[in-house]
Structures are given as C-alpha cells and as structure tokens.
C-alpha cells in the first residue's frame, strides 16, 4: 500500500529567518539541538520531521488499522478535547462511554451507539465551533478563549481524551511489548506532547488502594480506573488515555533567544501560519496512533499464541 500527499500551500520563504549558521533560534523549538546534532546539516523549511505535517502518515496508516479493528472486533476510537488553557470541560468522553456501557449492561457499545457518539462529536464542527468535544458549553467558551489569545499574539496549552471501545482483551505483553509502554511511547512521543496518562492518570496519586482498585464480578470489571490496561495487557474495558499538549511554541511576542552561533538576541517571529492551540487539530492523529498500536498488538498476540482467536476475559 502506497500513498502520496502533495502540499500546494507551502511557504518556504517564511523560514529564511532561521536558516544558515546565523539563523535565529525559535524558543520552544528544536532548532538549536537539531543544528548542533546534525553539525549544521538541517533543512529548516517547514520544520521537517519536527512538523505536525509529518503525522499525515500516522493518519493514513491509522485509517487502515481502524478498518481492521472495526471489522474484526467492532472497535471504535474517539477523541475529545477536554482542556484549553485553564478552562476544563465538565463533560468527559470517558463518562459518556460509561453511560453507553451501563445502558448495554456493561458489555459492548453497540454500532448504533458508536455512530451516534461520532455524530455528536462531528456536530460540534458543523455548528461553527472549532473544537471536537462532547461538551458543547465548553466548546463555545474555549473557542472564545482561543480567539482572544490569538489576538494577543500568544498561544494556549490543551489536553485531549482518546478512548477506544470494544477493545479485545488479552492483547499486549507483560514486559517488552507492554501495550501501556507502547501507547505512552506512541502518544507521548507525538510532537508537543508533554504528558500521557492512562485511565485515572495522575489522579491515582491522591487515592487509597481501596478507592482505586476496580471491583470485579463474574461478568467483568465494575469500574475502569485502570483505563483498560493492567500489567501492559488489555482487560476488555474501554482503553482510556489523556494527552496533554504544550502551548504552540511559535508566537509573535518578543522573546529572549540566540542565533545558532549563540549570539544573544531579542527574537521576534516575522512570518508564518501557526495555530494558537495545538489540541484543536491533534485528535485524529492520536486516534490513528492508538489504532496502529492496537492492531499491532492483535497481530503479535496471534503470532505468539496457540489460541489465536481468544480475545475474551469474561
């Protein structure tokens, strides 16, 4: 399978400010470390591999993985932006999915329910809101905050929930191919990501064991603090991740920086097209990377075990 994506909107001239041994170093970017690591042999146009443009390959591969997972297991993957700056959503994607599971007696989320949830997420875009989220009120407030911040020539951090439902159980390995480690590497390794949490994430640090342990009955787990992963292996519960992005590094405000020869300067961005909030566009890439890791884990499970069709725990 081969794919080619052509860009007709490139503006290479916007990067002249950063080119050559006297080029200016953008705070928050990889300019300085890439310049010295490559001994000066680096093409700054478009940001290269450090650009979010390169994740189009993830989306192409992820679209194929999603088809495979949906056909074999009914797996569906969703994302919802849940924080912009200090503003947090009051409705969570994981919570919406818990409601669907409760309606289905804790088993699988039906194709109809998956389609309805996807339609609800897409509806936010059709109404003119720029955010893909399950919380409509949050979307309107966050859109206003992003617009105001752009006018101030600044940027905002953000966070997204990424959730997979109808996930096959028993995939992943307890050590070197731990699905938790692979997901944290894949999602956490995405450009500008500063944190990747599984399940209840950092909230578990304030809990007692009696609060955090998920009760188990013969029909399955009664809660999902573990986020669908225990010991690097899936339990069949929804796979829940939260990914945090730093504010966009490219801003027009004056900043202290240096040239590549370490001459100190007051840096000002001269040209460029930059989003004030990275999380607005990141959802589809996170969904795609999650799909790729899940499909990879399924294929590894089938390659290593005799009972290759066993994907159930309860």
Positions of PLM-derived features:
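Short acidic, glycine/tyrosine-flanked loop/strand segments centered on an H-E-D-like triad
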Residues: 20-48, 256-274
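A short glycine/serine-rich beta->alpha loop
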Residues: 42-54, 169-173, 224-229, 273-284
